[in-house]
Design a protein with these regions (language model features):
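Long, well-structured alpha-helical subdomains associated
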Residues: 145-180
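Auxiliary, metal-adjacent structural segments of Zn-dependent hydrolase domains
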Residues: 16-78
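A short aromatic-anchored loop/beta-hairpin motif
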Residues: 8-17
């Protein structure tokens, strides 16, 4: 199975436009492969069988780097996902990086809609964004990978936000009927 995952990631990972040393490229590939290896089989198969159309791009840091973000586009037949990973994220500690990738895979598993399908009003849009982030986190937790998500959250947000996010995830998991 590891060979299948490795081939899948290599076909989807795009470093174009960035100049890196070979060791940095190999380290990033290895980390992305490890994230996929941690997925439960039924979730992994969504990617391997093409049910989730994914490309992964390593991009130059914008003026305000965002770490990682999934962009969704709707084609005539399906949702197409692009996981953009800013160059800076390649330097993150491995568990932080894995937590971030797993969270993005949670978005894709949950079929994150394109931005233009989100609510238009500012408050409603913010609440929607918060709910989809929480859903992605809850999925990662339900996969038994809470520790990676917690590392990502604590490296990314102030502690008082992490407390709120953890509470929201716990509440969502209760409504989903899943154990933490």
């Amino acid at each position: 199975m590891n060979h299948v995952i490795s081939d899948y990631v290599k076909r989807r990972l795009d470093f174009k436009g960035l100049k890196h040393d070979k060791s940095k490229i190999e380290a990033t590939k290895s980390r992305v492969i490890r994230a996929f290896e941690n997925l439960p089989l039924e979730i992994l198969n969504l990617f391997l069988d093409g049910s989730r159309n994914l490309s992964i791009k390593i991009i130059p840091d914008p003026k305000l780097p965002f770490g990682m973000r999934t962009i969704t586009e709707r084609s005539s037949k399906e949702l197409v996902y692009t996981l953009n990973i800013c160059d800076e994220a390649q330097g993150w500690a491995e568990d932080h990086f894995l937590g971030a990738v797993l969270r993005q895979l949670g978005h894709i598993t949950a079929e994150l809609p394109p931005d233009d399908e989100w609510p238009k009003e500012r408050g409603a849009r913010a609440r929607f964004k918060e709910s989809i982030e929480c859903k992605a986190d809850a999925l990662v937790w339900s996969w038994g990978l809470r520790h990676y998500d917690m590392i990502y959250l604590s490296e990314t947000y102030p502690s008082h936000w992490v407390d709120k996010i953890v509470n929201d995830i716990s509440m969502m998991m209760l409504t989903m009927g899943k154990d933490q």
